[in-house]
Design a protein with these regions (language model features):
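N-terminal secretory signal peptides
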Residues: 26, 31-69, 73-74
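Sec-dependent bacterial lipoprotein signal peptides
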Residues: 1-16
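Short, low-complexity, polar/charged sequence segments that are solvent-exposed and flexible
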Residues: 54-58, 72, 80-81, 95-96, ...
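Short, well-ordered, aromatic-rich surface patches in folded extracellular/luminal domains
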Residues: 5, 18-43, 94-169
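A short, structured loop/turn motif at beta-sheet edges
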Residues: 53-57, 76-86, 122-128
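A short-motif feature that recognizes glycine-rich, charge-decorated loops
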Residues: 61-98
Length: 169
């Protein structure tokens, strides 16, 4: 009975050690926004992941499906890459502290189903987050530049090899 109890305790300790704590980035020292970008799933083989980049250049990629990294992966960006990322997204940023949603039936007339959704979130200190939610099935011409910017993010941050599925799986 004693051995059985010890095995239960050992198993509980192992499970507690694998509790799946979410990796976090250090709080940035440099002033600026931490930008989170999430690519949601589609009804196909679209890479699904979330990433965060701080103004200090720290990045964290958290894969969900169809990426070439098996788990949370840290990366760094140069100050120029961070500025380019921030500037490319600035034109789509909603009013500070608000959420803007671009989706079928709300502000999109031409919509294709089964496409991934994207979320871009800007946070700084304790201020309320600013968030843009974009359903990429929205094919309105007015959102063409947003679609192109989203498609360029992996190259912009030099993580395209991490978010594309490997050729052999």
């Amino acid at each position: 009975m004693k051995v059985h109890g010890m095995m239960i305790l050992a198993g509980a300790a192992l499970v507690a050690g694998c509790s799946g704590e979410r990796p976090e980035l250090e709080k940035p020292v440099a002033a600026g926004d931490t930008i989170r970008f999430s690519a949601g799933p589609c009804f196909g083989v679209c890479p699904s992941y979330s990433l965060r980049v701080t103004p200090d250049g720290s990045g964290l990629l958290e894969p969900e499906r169809f990426t070439s990294v098996p788990g949370a992966t840290r990366f760094t960006v140069t100050p120029a890459q961070y500025r380019r990322f921030r500037s490319a997204l600035a034109q789509f940023r909603p009013v500070a502290g608000t959420v803007k949603r671009i989706s079928s039936g709300e502000n999109c007339t031409r919509f294709a189903t089964d496409m991934p959704g994207y979320t871009i979130e800007w946070t700084r200190d304790e201020r309320p987050a600013t968030r843009l939610e974009f359903q990429s099935g929205c094919m309105d011409a007015s959102y063409g530049k947003l679609r192109a910017t989203i498609a360029a993010i992996p190259r912009m941050l030099d993580i395209d090899a991490m978010v594309k599925p490997s050729a052999v799986r």
